[in-house]
Curated annotation (Swiss-Prot):
GO terms for molecular function: ATP binding; metal ion binding; pantothenate kinase activity. Substrate binds at Y81, G85, I86, D87, R88, T157. Pathway: Cofactor biosynthesis; coenzyme A biosynthesis; CoA from (R)-pantothenate: step 1/5. Keywords: ATP-binding, Coenzyme A biosynthesis, Cytoplasm, Kinase, Metal-binding, Nucleotide-binding, Potassium, Transferase. PANTHER family: TYPE III PANTOTHENATE KINASE. It is an enzyme of class 2 (transferase). The lineage of its organism: Bacteria, Pseudomonadati, Campylobacterota, Epsilonproteobacteria, Campylobacterales. Belongs to the type III pantothenate kinase family. It catalyses: (R)-pantothenate + ATP = (R)-4'-phosphopantothenate + ADP + H(+). Its EC number is 2.7.1.33. This is Type III pantothenate kinase. GO terms for biological process: coenzyme A biosynthetic process. HAMAP family: Pantothen_kinase_3. Signal peptide: none annotated.
């Protein structure tokens, strides 16, 4: 990348998180998402800084906005984990101490202490759980149903499927978190937070990490 331009405010640029399903943006502190087919219609005029976990969607972005810049190499997250996804790195960069849960197409759980990533695990996303039940047995092909509590044991198959799914995710998070604060992001974050008393939803968590990375790289001026 040539001499890096410096920006004084987030209003002057666009952050982009390219996922496996959707492409997410933060522009002027507003969040929105797009399918790859609709990118050109967005008509973004400002400079785009992005991260990506999907090569095909990244190519789609660059076809529409060829000057967009990948910031993956602009920062360093202290970790011994090999192959940590860039989206997980950015979310962890935004948390100094605590547990980071990204509840998207997969559910990732990462521990951060004093800015160092200690490790983590990956679970299927809620939609993948439902798909697995469907493939396992016809009777387990049940629609997703939100639960209000895990205190009451289910008395029908639909509730039993959803109960087992949610309990397995919540138990794993609680086992790793102990009494630490839990930061949730991703599409199912708000739903899972209802079962986690020490949690907070931070829908901008990945973008907060990207902002920190840009500041560390001198691209975004610190205030």
């Amino acid at each position: 990348m040539p001499a890096r331009q410096s920006f004084t405010d987030l209003k002057n640029l666009v952050l982009c998180d390219i996922g496996n399903t959707h492409i997410h943006f933060a522009q002027n502190y507003q969040l929105f998402s797009s399918a790859k087919e609709d990118l050109k219609r967005l008509g973004i005029q400002k400079e785009i800084f992005y991260i990506s976990v999907n090569e095909e969607n990244e190519k789609a972005l660059l076809n529409c906005y060829p000057n967009a810049k990948n910031i993956a190499g602009f920062f360093h997250l202290e970790t011994d984990y090999i192959g940590l996804g860039i989206d997980r790195q950015m979310a962890c960069l935004a948390v100094n101490n605590g547990v980071v849960v990204d509840a998207g197409s997969a559910i990732t759980i990462d521990l951060v202490k004093e800015g160092k990533h200690l490790g983590g695990c990956i679970l299927p996303g809620l939609a993948q759980y439902i798909h697995a039940y469907k493939k396992s047995a016809k009777i387990l092909e049940q629609p997703f149903k939100t639960l209000d509590s895990l205190e009451i044991l289910p008395k029908n198959t639909r509730d039993a499927v959803n109960y087992g799914m949610i309990l397995s995710v919540i138990s794993c998070i609680q086992h790793l978190a102990k009494n630490q604060k839990i930061y949730l992001c991703g599409g199912d974050a708000k739903y899972l937070s209802a079962f986690l008393p020490h949690s907070v939803c931070k829908e901008r968590l990945v973008f907060d990490g990207m902002e920190i990375a840009l500041k560390k790289a001198g691209i975004l001026e610190c205030k």
